[in-house]
Amino acid sequence: MTIHRIEGFDGPAEGDLTSVTVDGTKVAVALVEGVLRAVDDTCTHMACSLSEGDIEGTSVVCPCHFGRFDLATGAVLGGPPERPIGVWRAALRDGALELER
């Protein structure tokens, strides 16, 4: 697996979302209960940007049709999506965001 480094990453605040691009793929990054989480930024229902949605507990809610995904597993927790989203391993090291899938 390849580790992708994003230098100078100033991460989201607790309970917030941001997005980064890795090899042309948008990745939503969130800090939830002190844990950095990263998932594909595209909802599997209608391709809306999850980083523009909301965090509820340990899930992200799509802003378009309110589909809900678990940030740790990518599983669909509710709403119209039928397929899970991709999950990335995320870590902050030496001022850089490291993502791996």
Language model regions located:
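Short Gly/Pro-enriched loop/turn and capping motifs at secondary-structure junctions
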Residues: R68
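Short glycine/proline-centered loop/turn elements that form peptide/ligand docking sites
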Residues: G79
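Short cysteine clusters
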Residues: C43, C62-H65
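N-terminal pre-ligand scaffold of iron-sulfur
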Residues: M1-G57, L71, A75, R83-R101
